[in-house]
């Protein structure tokens, strides 16, 4: 064969040489250059090499396939031998065999081993089928058996014996589980009897085979379900037992509280007897059933409603007691204001009646404790408020024009006024003492002292502010009246007093001509006697002192003005005597007039002076069109100086500011008649 191959190669080489020579001749005829010839020869050489390489590769792949098949066959032979028990299987190949002959020998040996493996698998499958059946009944996992049957990795006789021993164990476990199922079913039946549940319905829900004793399922899942069912029923039993025991305790408490007759208690005797029993001791049928518990609950609810009704009555009484204490002590209790502390809160279920009763009791104790600490201060507050009421009554009394009219009970009113004045004089000290007490109480307890929801210190502060404003206003009025009295005194000293209207019906005396002429001449100021000026200035000073003394005495004594006093008795309107200027000085407006009460001038209050002096409808003002220049009159009588020139126009209006208000001066009747206005 080698010789034939060599001859074939030489023949091919001869053929290739002939073809190459023919190709060179053609190239010569064509006139190809040497470079072109070399390039063409290189291409031919490459093409030949590629053909050889392709053939070599195909032959190599064929050899590799044969080697692979032989290797696979030998590997399968080794695997079967290993799975059959680890026996060593020798190869039956001979020396000098080619690959195809070797592959044929391997295939023959492999067929024999496959037959032996199939026979072994039949024996294994019989045991595995029984294992699978018992595993399914017991609920054991079967994945490893299915995997073993599919893989067939271990078919040794030792493995077969192991599977047979597992089969025996599963058979024993099945018998034990049957006994366990019977025990669980018995326990479940007992629980269902106590709880009043349907036993057959419950086990049928777990597995239908449990009803029939011949074909009961003994799988682990069934046992677990039975165990879970028993656990749940025991928990339900414990819960119901606890509930029944709580209801029994509530029944006993309500019976003792409401004095329930013994005949009604006998109905629930079995329930009350179960208070001290344990879970295992309660075996009476249907004692923990839903219907039995519902019956006990209804009884407890009925008795609880009666109890709540009585508690509501107690709460209402407690609230009334708390309201009475709070009202007497003028305290604002938050419990009474809150909606959660009312009977409606109990009815709506927001508050527990007993809890609310305890809170009200604690609030009553708290209020009583606080009331004891507030008692002394409250007495002082009530005294202060009573004094304030007397102060208000005294102010109203002083404004009454008819307070001194003789009548029934007038002397009692006067006595009350005197007592009120004494009490009002004590108000500043009373306020200071009360403020100190309240401040100390608040600092000690850390809370505000409230009186009917208002802080007492705020009330005292407001009272102080109002009192200071009143005092300031009174002082301003006194200053105004004092200044007004001085101005009126100066006017009367210069021009005489204004005559009062004739109320007796008699014709007034005519003024002497000389006095009238002297007053007319006083317009120029040159003919006014110096003696008259001195007398009037002296009298003016006396009148001012007298008026100030009377005003001070009236202010200190706080005597009200008399009702029914005449207009002629007011300062500035007192009628002067019709005497010559040089003969007599003008009389003081505070001197008593004939036929007038002794205390009429003394008791005249500054308010009456101010009111009459400023009555715009009755006074006669000097026209301001004749004024050329206003000049302020000095406030002291000694500073009054008469004009010395007759041609100088008279300055009728006097301007004096007091607290930014104009004081308007009134003129006497003689001045009006003389033409000053």
Curated annotation (Swiss-Prot):
UniProt name for this protein: 65-kDa microtubule-associated protein 4
Complex and partners: Forms a dimer. Binds to microtubules (MT). Bundles polymerized MT via the formation of 25-nm crossbridges with centrally located endocytic MT.
Modified residues (Phosphoserine): 500
UniProt keyword annotations, A-Z: Cell cycle, Cell division, Coiled coil, Cytoplasm, Cytoskeleton, Microtubule, Mitosis, Nucleus, Phosphoprotein
Record Pfam families: MAP65_ASE1
Function: Microtubule-associated protein involved in mitotic spindle formation.
Residue ranges of coiled coil: 49-121, 151-189, 354-383
Basic and acidic residues: bias regions: 606-631
Similarity remark: Belongs to the MAP65/ASE1 family.
Induction: Cell cycle-regulated expression with higher levels during mitosis.
Cellular localization per UniProt: Nucleus; Cytoplasm; Cytoplasm, Cytoskeleton, Spindle pole
Protein species of origin: Arabidopsis thaliana
Gene: MAP65-4
Superkingdom of the organism of origin: Eukaryota
InterPro entries reported for this sequence: MAP65_Ase1_PRC1 (IPR007145)
Residue(s) at site: Microtubule binding: 406, 417
